[in-house]
Amino acid sequence: MTIRDKNKSAHKLRGFGPIYCINLDGQPERWEYMKEQFDYWEIKNYERISAYDGRDDDLSGIVKGLYPTNITPGEIGCTTSHLKAMKHYLDTSDAPYAIMMEDDCDLDVVRFWNFNWIDVYAYFPYDWDVIQLAIICTGDIHVKLHKRFVNDFSTACYVISRHHAEKLVRLHCRGGYTGKQTYKLDQGVKPRPVADDLVYNSGNTFSIPLLMYKIELGSSIHPEHIGVWHNGSHKALWQYWQQMGSGINIADHMNYDPYLGRVTEATAPPPEPETYPEEGKV
């Protein structure tokens, strides 16, 4: 991102926060990218969370209980970093929700919004736990608010309610202050204790792709996924917001269908209609 003129759309993200941005110590260029975005969008309410790097470090010292065997070291680092961010949020803020963000989140698409963050928050479902704001989907992307599909991937950015963060910290964090705790990942998270499953599958999660991810930064954990899944979702969403953003009715966009994707198909043949003898005949 280069230095640009004053952002005339900065008001759209007024009230967007507190933000807890997860960043590896060994990737300062990503943190510079995020700080430039925050400055451009006039966002002040953010903090950097130093991430655990499971790719190069042995994280067995911070994992309590059985060490997960069905996820990669990088995925363990990602999951524990998100839990660390939640613990820090609860320890240092009394805000009713927090925005968890990874260091490849892209805010540029906000310029296509014809609404603002306060409008979006006003339409959150009454019983929400998590709202996923950035999506990488292996199928068709549903652009309106919806109950999260299992193939709506990415923890690049999501909003988490305080009570759900408290639940996850209670289940998975052990010890005292932020940075000193250990983590339990053997609590039966299905299908695996990766960040997506641990955060989203443990509560009432909705998804709406209001933000994006910086495709040029690649992926620290799954670089092989960029060309397979990330590129397609990114291109489709960018075109959608560029072409359709100015005409969106946010009230309609946030009015989710509670039955979407939640009705089982009938695979058994329908029953034969019952027949009755004509009146007067046996």
Predicted regions and their residues:
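An acidic/histidine-cluster motif and surrounding catalytic segment
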Residues: 1-101, 105-282
